[in-house]
Curated annotation (Swiss-Prot):
InterPro entries associated with the record: Glutathione-S-Trfase_C-like (IPR010987), Glutathione-S-Trfase_C_sf (IPR036282), Glutathione_S-Trfase_N (IPR004045), GST_C (IPR004046), GST_C_Theta (IPR040077), GST_N_Theta (IPR040075), GST_Theta (IPR051369), Thioredoxin-like_sf (IPR036249)
GO molecular function, one term: glutathione transferase activity
Keyword hit for Transferase: yes
Protein name according to UniProt: Glutathione S-transferase theta-2B
Family, similarity comment: Belongs to the GST superfamily. Theta family.
Tissue: Expressed at low levels in liver. In lung, expressed at low levels in ciliated bronchiolar cells, alveolar macrophages and alveolar type II cells.
Disulfide bonds: none
Amino acid sequence: MGLELFLDLVSQPSRAVYIFAKKNGIPLELRTVDLVKGQHKSKEFLQINSLGKLPTLKDGDFILTESSAILIYLSCKYQTPDHWYPSDLQARARVHEYLGWHADCIRGTFGIPLWVQVLGPLIGVQVPEEKVERNRTAMDQALQWLEDKFLGDRPFLAGQQVTLADLMALEELMQPVALGYELFEGRPRLAAWRGRVEAFLGAELCQEAHSIILSILEQAAKKTLPTPSPEAYQAMLLRIARIP
């Protein structure tokens, strides 16, 4: 059996790995795990990834459970074009520098609007307004750092070409954008960066990867989202409670 990728395109890192694999012609058997239904908390999936998170890559008996590690693994295994994960030591270090900061300051912060506008209401929970405002402030600060520290006057986050850093960042920022947040308004450098990354990836691939998240508000309004399992419901309550 070939490589298996367990994913849900509602998930930002799942989309990053999906886009990377598609763009580079990497053969993967896709296994959809519905996050809203709570399939990532099922006994079957927990036997594959005890952390109960997506994406997860299975290469025979070898299992990887973190998106950045999966991207690096695929890049090296399939010898994708060097710009993604540069062989030059300093250029590669820049990619790792961003990915480390991304895990601390981007990942999680930009996912909170989905909990506020879709997932919380789905289970009858409203996130307190003071938490919503704190999250807006945190996103604004992170965008400023992203623009000033990592983008600067370069075309891409880690240099002159698209890298894994750009892909991870774009997918995280797409989450609130899909929910109506004007993240790029008043930020022409970031807006131009987004345009360059999407142009490189191609409109068709971006639309394919983003179609589910772009339609999730409409699904919520029409009440067509699936009902979470009891296990997922409890996990969702805990996640909402942890919003700072």
